Amino acid sequence: MSDLRVVLVGGDEALEEWRYVHNVVVPPAAMSFEEAGERLKRGYRLENVYDGDVLVGCSTVRPVVDGVVTLIARVLPEFRRRGFGAALYEHVLAYARVQGAEVVETCVLGVNEDGLRFARRYGFAEVERYVLDGESDEWVDLRLAL
C-alpha cells in the first residue's frame, strides 16, 4: 500500500467504479447503474478507494439513525491482505463517529470468509444469519458498539 486515496463518489464515472467493486465483491446483490445512483439519492455516502490510480475497493455508509450506522467496506479480492481494508474501515468508522454513531452494523455475504474474519477481528459480533425470500444466498448481519 503506497498511495491510498479515498474519494467521495461524484459523477457517473466514479459511480460506475463504485458499482463495479460492489458487484465483484457481492455478486448476488449486483446492481445496475440506476440502482447504484438510488443509493446516492437516499443519502448514502459512497466512496472509492485507490492505490495511486488503481481502484482497489469501495465503501458505503448509510445515514445514522437513532445512533446506529451501517457501514460496509469492500476490497477487490486481488488487493486483500495488503492493509487496504483496515485503512478503509478506519476511514469510514471515523466518519461515522463524527456523524454521531454509537453502534455500527455491517452485512457480509455468508460465503465471504475474508469479510467475516475481517469484521470479527475488529470486534463485530454476529447478530443474525438469513436468506432473503426467493433467494439462496446466506447473509450475515454483524454489530459493534462504539
PLM segments and residue spans:
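Conserved acetyl-CoA-binding loop-helix of GNAT-fold acetyltransferases
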Residues: 81-94, 98, 117-121
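Short amphipathic alpha-helix that is part of the acyltransferase structural core
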Residues: 1-31, 140-145
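Short coil/loop residues immediately preceding or within conserved phosphate-binding loops
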Residues: 43-44, 56, 66, 70, ...
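Conserved GNAT acetyl-CoA-binding A-motif
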Residues: 96-110
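Conserved catalytic-core motifs of GNAT/GCN5-like acyltransferases
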Residues: 107-109, 120-141
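Active-site rim helix/loop that mediates acceptor-substrate recognition in acyltransferases
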Residues: 22-60
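Glycine-rich phosphate/pyrophosphate-binding loop shared by adenosine-nucleotide-utilizing enzymes
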Residues: 2-4, 52-58, 69
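A short, internal acetyl-CoA/4′-phosphopantetheine-binding micro-motif in the GNAT/acyltransferase core
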Residues: 72-81, 108-109
